[in-house]
Amino acid sequence: FCSFDYIEVAENWVYHLNKHNITNYVIIAMDTETYNYLDDRKINTKLIHGKILKRSGTGWKFRFQTMYELLKEGNILHCDLDAIWLKDARNLLDDEHDIIASKDDGGWPPKAYEHLNFTMCMGWIFFRNNDNVKNIFEKILEKESDFDDQEEFNDYIVDNLKDNNIYYKNENERILEVDNVKVRVLNETDVFRGNYNEASYVCHPLIKKQANKQVQLKKRGLWYNEK
């Protein structure tokens, strides 16, 4: 998802994908100016007018609704533009699980964190196109007011999760089962919530939503002309 103030961040993200010959991506342009800029540069993009607020707690229903519409067409892997692919992270996917999520130890949202001691980050998350997964989307989208999609998704999972449906796998991964949906939560290193780490597939540093993403990514060694 991209607005015009994120244009250079989007180009940096695509640069890293191109290094791994990844071409089956699409950036959702939320305004015509952004769409035209990306399209002129042969960057895969789709125009869906909308807005995402740069704060936690609300303003993210548009993203979740758009992901649901895309999910109807096939499996999707949603990735924030400041989550930089150092390796081909498609290798983290499998055919067994319905949702594969990156792990967040930052404490948001608090309800899920208190229950699980971690949360699932919407900044890198795979959804399989099947009825059970779409049913979760539909239940969350029944809420009429705007919301923070990471909060609503995590809260839905813990509200419907039985304690005996939490498993540990090798490499410190977690497996959850909710509503006949198998959720795999990756370990901290594979999608790393920190600065450049050569051991990681993806580095998704913790950056305040109001911060200048370009400046922060450069500081953290995740800009295309810094490595």
What are the language-model segments listed below?
Residues 1-58, 69-73, 210:
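N-terminal anchoring/stem segment of glycosyltransferases
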Residues 29-35, 85-89, 189-192:
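Short, polar loop motifs at secondary-structure junctions
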Residues 127-227:
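Catalytic core and acceptor-binding pocket of nucleotide-sugar-dependent glycosyltransferases
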